């Protein structure tokens, strides 16, 4: 790429232009999803600004409340949740919201209701705020059949029903990765323009990667297939080079690297967390949707992740996602154990 020429490019594909182009492909589209996504983008810009100024503005530190997951809430968590709830409700396109920070689902006032449900984690990896490690927002969007009579059952859909999913990573740059079911694209926030610009068009994950990403501190509690897979990563029997371990501890950052470079991200079940640790609706499903759209796979240890039907809004699940061949290898190990 000619960076000098790139610096003077004037024909920039903004995220708004991209979403409008996608909308124009569907003759039946009325623009509701476009409006909803524009409100999510605004929320991401707001949170990106707050994250950048957190230390200076004294937003770092505990807020003195505990969320539904039993984690002490940090000021930025609380702020980010408020920002996204207000942005989503004010769009007039949502009827129910599920946030990682709120114990109950939020049902939108009938006068402001639209046809979408949004499940989101407003600030994933927030324990990393104090040390400047990348953190992010994750979201998944579903269509609701009857917005006038929406119930909790409407929220508990399998991930394959999602119409769009994405995440925004607040790191060395602010990157928003989005799929509306037609591939995956990455946009980077240009602070001078205040716009997300298309920088990673049509992301495709490599078929096989050289990296595995897992918290090896939990190794003593793993099941046999997970332990075998990690052992093969470190000590391959076929004479090939071992895989490199990369683990940040922020799901958005770890999945982002996996998506771009290939490999596999795993957060398996173990004796301490027999149902896994990551939440289905706003962590497992959106990331699995993106991974499949980019040509990868996602697996729970029992089934394709997007086929899972949750029974409660904060349900957890084990997850293995990444390059197609790497996840295929993990599926083979679980199939062998089941025989």
UniProtKB/Swiss-Prot annotation:
Disruption phenotype: Reduced tiller numbers, pale-green leaves, reduced growth rate and dwarf phenotype. It catalyses: beta-D-fructose 1,6-bisphosphate + H2O = beta-D-fructose 6-phosphate + phosphate. GO terms for cellular component: cytoplasm; cytosol. GO terms for biological process: fructose 1,6-bisphosphate metabolic process; fructose 6-phosphate metabolic process; fructose metabolic process; gluconeogenesis. One of its GO terms (molecular function) is metal ion binding. Pfam families: FBPase, FBPase_C. Mg(2+) 3 binds at residues 121, 124, 283. Keywords: Carbohydrate metabolism, Cytoplasm, Hydrolase, Magnesium, Metal-binding. PROSITE patterns: FBPASE (PS00124). InterPro entries: FBPase_C_dom, FBPase_class-1, FBPase_N, FBPtase, Fructose_bisphosphatase_AS. It comes from the Eukaryota. PANTHER family: FRUCTOSE-1,6-BISPHOSPHATASE, CYTOSOLIC (PTHR11556:SF41), FRUCTOSE-1,6-BISPHOSPHATASE-RELATED (PTHR11556). Homotetramer. In plants there are two FBPase isozymes: one in the cytosol and the other in the chloroplast. This is Fructose-1,6-bisphosphatase, cytosolic. It comes from Oryza sativa subsp. japonica (Rice).
